[in-house]
Amino acid sequence: MNIKSELNYSNGSNDSDIYNEYGGGSGDETYNKSDTVDFRSKVIPQQSNLPPINNKTDRSHFRESMVASKKTIGAFVISDIAIGKGAFATVFKGLNTLSGDFVAIKRFEKSKISNEQHSSVSTEFDILQRLNHENIVRILGREENENYIYIFLEYMENGSLSTILNNFGTFPESLICNYVENVLKGLVYLHQEGVIHRDIKAANILINKAGEAKLSDFGTAGEIIKESDKRYSVVGTPYWMAPEVIEISGHCQVSDIWSLGCTIIELFTSYPPYFDLNPLGAMYRICQDDRPPLPDDISSELANFLERCFCKSTEERATAKELLSHPWITKNRTNLINHQRNSSKQFTSPQIIINNHQKSLLSNSSGGDDSVTDSDLSISNQSSRSSSFLLDDGGGGGGSKNHTVILTKQQPTPDQIEFNKMQMELQLLRLRVGELETDLKKEQDLKKDSDRKYREILLSSMHYIYIIDSTMNTITNSGGQSIKPQISNDVNHLRSIMRDQIETEYFQTFPDDNMVPRFIQRRFTHVDQANMMIPKKALEAQKRREKEQEKLKEQEKLKEKKKEKDIKKEKDKKDKKDKQLKDSSSSTTTTNSTPSTPDHSAFHSSPITPLSPVRENSKPFLSLKGRSSSKIFNE
């Protein structure tokens, strides 16, 4: 056997010796099993850098430790990553094992919170559970064990405004306005639901990955039944407190507006008003000053907005709904829409650049091909506000010329921008209406389908019951005689109960339809009614309807009679009044025609009672002796 070895070992002999030992020297020799080959090498092999097979790396050890330390609370897995920490709770990042979404898990340690703080946790859960708004953090659940209380919340990727402020510095006015508009929408919903937040500040406003602001931390929130109601407790953070809260004159809905104004100054300057003072000094200044000092370099609209927020009187202070229509909000909203429209135009409005490299294409003087190739026409997406025509001679009259023609639209006027904006909003509303109509139609179809199936089930049950009744009423024997089958009382009672239940369900579900189903009516025509069990509920319903119709007819008749009586009474009253007027007019004419004589009969007929004699010492008259005439006159 000829084996050609290509192994290159260094063992003291050359490659040809090894090759010949395998019988490859002459090509005719065969391999002998007794021959030995020495593969010993003088070179010591080095240790390999590759890891051994099935060896566990540090990463695998890390995963094992993660699996061992994994904490599962209900359907959620809590990690060791703390994304926030407050006075009473720590917030961790978690995973929803059902949906795969990240969640925020707020953990309260029972040993470190008082009974009052425990009630605030329950209040926060109860309030968040019944709230549902796009600018309020959603609650996903609650769990509790011996040591901790867990509240599962919507995960906000960008964190709080306070964290963003610490990482990126103060915000521009336009961005602050966007966040404030979202917060105002959430406050409008809260106040409509009878809830006041009572702790509005940057740390309690969270931002998701879409840049939308949402209110969070409802541990100090309170509920009010009416807008005029107030909560008489000092709750909140001192620098953001409204004066009526500090003075314990009542915490109301517009107290959140004062805190919102302080939050705007916080986002603009990194600190709330009076932050250079201690909390007690700040609270004193809040109550004594007319309003907090406003930052410099703010627009007049924002200054007016803050003045509306910082009105000392709660009756004069603006509400969240009123501030949503403030010029500072509406102007920024318009600017944002225009900016988005212009940025979209930058990619959708192309400039057509026509490059003509041949002079004949412009002058059309030569007889060559006048077609424009793909290289002569190019489209650029660079936006420009002016149109230009550039001519570049390549030298001399016969040189080539490059012409660049930029075609752009004229800048739209403000009226056109407003019109386009309204058109866009109208189109969005139409799309939304169409979606709602489609959803409504689907729901109506589903309801009709479910009603149809339900009715079919009821009708089938009734059909089955009446088939049993008809077969058990009469049975024809071999001699052609009709006999009644003998059934036990229990079976008969059970059959009656089932029939009554099904009939009641059917006639209560479909009261306006035909009372007797068609298959029963058909059986009435084929079977003798004397031997047929008529549906009791159907007859009762029909009788009840007939009585109601008769009652309605009687009521209508009574109404007509009453109306006729009223008309007749009014007519009699009017006739009587006219008659009295005629009589009075005739009597006045007779009295004017005849002279009247004085009648003294009443005077003569009335008896005259004589005056009783007055005694000297009797009351009320006293003796006049020794008294002057002036005194007597004065008396």
UniProtKB/Swiss-Prot annotation:
One of its GO terms (cellular component) is cytoplasm. SMART domains: S_TKc (SM00220). ATP binds at I83, G84, K85, G86, A87, F88, A89, T90, V91, K106. Residues 417-456, 536-585 form a coiled coil. Residues 360-405, 540-635 are annotated as: Disordered. Residues 360-392, 583-598 have a biased composition (Low complexity). SUPFAM superfamilies: Protein kinase-like (PK-like). It is an enzyme of class 2 (transferase). One of its GO terms (molecular function) is ATP binding. PROSITE patterns: PROTEIN_KINASE_ATP, PROTEIN_KINASE_DOM, PROTEIN_KINASE_ST. The active site is at D199. Its cofactor is Mg(2+). Residues 540-582 have a biased composition (Basic and acidic residues). Its EC number is 2.7.11.1. It catalyses: L-seryl-[protein] + ATP = O-phospho-L-seryl-[protein] + ADP + H(+); L-threonyl-[protein] + ATP = O-phospho-L-threonyl-[protein] + ADP + H(+). Residues 626-635 have a biased composition (Polar residues). Keywords: ATP-binding, Coiled coil, Kinase, Magnesium, Metal-binding, Nucleotide-binding, Serine/threonine-protein kinase, Transferase. Residues 77-329 form the Protein kinase domain. Belongs to the protein kinase superfamily. STE Ser/Thr protein kinase family. This is Probable serine/threonine-protein kinase DDB_G0270146. It comes from Dictyostelium discoideum (Social amoeba). The lineage of its organism: Eukaryota, Amoebozoa, Evosea, Eumycetozoa, Dictyostelia.
